[in-house]
Every structure is written in structure tokens, then in C-alpha cells.
Amino acid sequence: MLLKNCRIIKDNKIIEGDILIDENGRIKKIAKDIKVDDEIIDIKNSLVIPGVIDAHVHFRWGEEKKEDFLSGSLAGINGGVCFAIDMPNNKPPITTKELFYKKLEDCKKDSKINVFLNFGVTENNYLGTVEDAKAYKIFMVKSVGDLFIEDYSKLKDILNQNKLFCIHAEHKDVINENLKKYQLNSWIDHCKIRDEKSEVEAVKEVIKNLKIIDRQSNKKPHVHFCHISTKEALYLIKKVRQELKNIKITVEVTPHHIYLNKDMAEELKGFGKFNPPLREKDDNIALIKGIVNKDVDIIASDHAPHLLEDKLKNVKNCPSGIPGIETIVPLTLNLVNKGLISLFDAIRVLSKNPAKIFNINNKIEEGNLANLTIIDLKKEGKINAELFKSKAKFSPFDGWEVKGFPIYTVINGTLYEAYGCKC
């Protein structure tokens, strides 16, 4: 297959040329005016970027009514996503090797995109290693079963390892105190209970332990903070990054924490209920600035599908989480078209940095498997949840006019139409 008339993003430059993909799905040649007797796809000067990596998804293994590896991966293709990293808070949680490899087997059998798995850290299993785990996930607040670090005094020992840890940073004690003050009667109450302080104090707790490890240990953990949502937490992480010598810290944010805020809580209802919750407008602005000044390393969707009937329930019975793998690319490109970030910022947080952090090869180079996201930066259209391939056909962004869409997704050399071809 020959991709004709490409504008290829490589090393912060745009290169014009063609991409020839061989029968094994590998990039055989990148050059101008390639002549070949093969299938030719004229992509008409669209941009070809290294395959987008969504480093935070929940494909709901064990809860197939909500999503499964097939539907989740088809949603990824539709959204221009070539790689995804699935979280371990399943039912049952992925806290043993046996469950990990059972889940991995199902993933390899059913997924149409490249999916990796994180392993769940508990107070009892933290010294174990799982060779095929992409990272180790720590929940600082109640999750599923024993997938939760309840005793924060154990964090130092847990983090004192040469591992990549992904941390859900919400402080259990702050949330428990807030539960004494607030009743969950309105959508804004969800934001009050899991308030900004809960994230900030959790980040402080992790930082305190990392400083001790940095001073006293020769271990070099890498801590990746998932879905940071507040300007204060972002500032604390920026500050400590400059102080630590042997420890790497990276930061992830989501499109919903960039675009949505508390002012929208009552209007969005269940479609605005997720963890961490809606924040302030100032936090939206801080996250965008964080992308530009590189305090934010990646954007991930935290794709968390639920049954629509459950998301339409009242605030007490509505589960937290929204689908996002099909909107992550257009919402990020929309920031480019609004002049809030550059095209190269977008590629850095969607492709380049996730590849570095999680050791994923998505480079557009001869000999590599062709995992490519092809985008039309100028295409305008509406986000239409009815066109989603996810089982969760709803979104807080449904009906939003945005500019910039994925039009094709190439997975290991196979080309698929993406959402931008349909909207």
C-alpha cells in the first residue's frame, strides 16, 4: 500500500513525500514520488503523525456490557488512536499475575489496536514484578477490591523501586472529611466532596516520599501522575521536578479537565461526573498553559464507558467516568486551531511524549511497523456520539463544533477510516 501526497510530521518538521507500506505492515520506503504497482491511497496533503497513544483507558474487561477489547479498540481506530494502555481496576482487579495474563490473552485475541496493560499495586503485592506490564498503577483512594493504598505510610517502600508508577492522586482522608460536611444531593456536591484539596494533598503525600527516596536511596522510580486537574498540583509538581536528582516525574491531563469546569456541572449532569471531578475555569487555563510550557507531558482520555441508563441516574447512583478515546484527537487539534497550543505541542502530548514515557515505538521510520494517525487539521465538524464505535454512545462534547479531525488510522500497516471521514 502506498500513501500518496503525505505531509509527514517528523522531528518537529513537516516533510512532504509518500509512504510505502509492505505486505508485513512495515514502512518500506519514505520518499517523494514513489512509483509502485500497488494499492494507492491519495491522502491529499493531510498530515501524517506518529500513531497517537492514549495512555489511560478502561476497556472494561469483565464488564462487557459497558465495553470490551473489540468495541474499545474499534473506538480507538475511529478516534485516530493506534495504541492504548488499559487500567487494572477491573472486576476482579488485576492484582495477580494469573489475572493479568488472563486479561492479556483476551486483549491479544480481541483488540484491533495495540493495547498494553497496567498492573494494579496493593499493600501486599507491591514488591512483585510482571514482565509484560507497561506500568504499575497506584490508587490513593478506594477503587475495586484491594486495589487501593489505604496506609499512606507504606508509600515510601512501594515507590522505592526502579519501576514506572501511574498514580491516581486523590487523598482519601480529605474526601472522608468532606463526606462529613456535604451530602451528595447535587452535581456540584460531587466536586465539593472530591475537591481541589484532595488532589493537592495526595500530590504532596507522594512528593514527600519521593524526596526521602531521592535523598536516601539509589533507586530511580518514575512517577507518572494521572489526570492532574488543578493548577496548584501542577505547580507543586513543576517545583519538585527541579529539585529531584534521581527521580523522574511526568504529568497527564485529560481533555475534559481542559474544556469543562464547575460552572457546567448542573447542565452536564451525569455526563460531567468523573474522578477527579470538574474544577474551576482557572484550572482549565492552567492546564493549557502547562501544555505550552511543557509542565504537562501528555494528554490521555481516561476513557471510562458506562451504560447510558446508568449515566442518566441521579447523582447518588450515577457512576463516575465518560468515554473519551474517540474525542481525544479532535479536542486536542481544536486547541491548535484556537491558537492555544501549537501543532507540535499537540503531537508532543499525543504521540511523542507517551512513546518516551511508556517505551512504545511509534516512530515514522523505514523498517518500523506502520502505526500512523492521519489528520485533517482544517476539517470542521460536530462531535456526534451516535457515530461512536464505543458501546458508550454519549459524551459531554456531543454536538460541539470543533476543527481538526483524524481521517485515517493505520494499525500495523492496515488502513482504516477514522471519525473525520464520517462527520
UniProtKB/Swiss-Prot annotation:
| Reactions this protein catalyses | (S)-dihydroorotate + H2O = N-carbamoyl-L-aspartate + H(+)
The protein depicted here goes by the name Dihydroorotase
Function in brief: Catalyzes the reversible cyclization of carbamoyl aspartate to dihydroorotate.
Which top EC class is given? hydrolase
Q: Which PANTHER family match?
A: ALLANTOINASE
- An annotated GO cellular component: cytoplasm
Please name the Pfam families in this protein's record: Amidohydro_1
Q: Which residues bind substrate?
A: 58-60, 89, 306
GO MF terms here are: allantoinase activity; dihydroorotase activity; zinc ion binding
NCBIfam families per the record?
pyrC_multi
- Keyword terms, alphabetized: Hydrolase, Metal-binding, Pyrimidine biosynthesis, Zinc
Q: Name one GO biological process term.
A: 'de novo' UMP biosynthetic process
Q: Which residues bind Zn(2+) 2?
A: 137, 168, 227
